[in-house]
Amino acid sequence: VKASDPIAIAMDIDAAGLPFLKNLTPPAGSKTVEELRDIVRLAEKPFIVKGIMTPKGALKAVEAGASAIVVSNHGGRVQGCTPATAEVLPSIAKAVKGRVKIFVDGGIRSGVDVFKAIALGADGELIGRPVVPFIYAEGAEGFRVYMDRIVSQLRDTMNMCGTPSLADIGEDNIFIAK
């Protein structure tokens, strides 16, 4: 991995129970802050911890030295009873905002979804599955078309909500059911 000189290294912490990760040596599973800190140190690059679903988990990642976290539940495939990332994002952002970059995935399908995620505390959003058909059909051009649509939708939403910049987007721009 180091030979490829990546800009960052990430570790997925919430998939240890998936069938293809069983019987690994060393075993996949929970890591203490100290173990995670050792991994971060060995990376020698900005380190991203993916699979954060609680403020406690986010604080552990910060304590271990992570540069960023990804609020992610693998689309509920790891445990079907996990909440949506949008439900937990505000409390996680409240716990660690400004100390680490906060990314979110899961359910991001449009520029409106990107707007909502920013309003809930994300610094950035990860989109995977929805873009695959565009890339499969048209390669890099398909990716560009998809991303242009997301950006256009985000700009339209920002204009409709009176938010001239990403920094102006906040919880007061969206309705949160209690």
What positions do the PLM features span?
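Alpha/beta enzyme core
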Residues: 1-104, 111-134, 176
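Beta-strand segments within the central parallel beta-sheet cores of soluble alpha/beta enzyme folds
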Residues: 103-105, 169-170
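C-terminal extensions of enzymes
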Residues: 131-132, 138-178
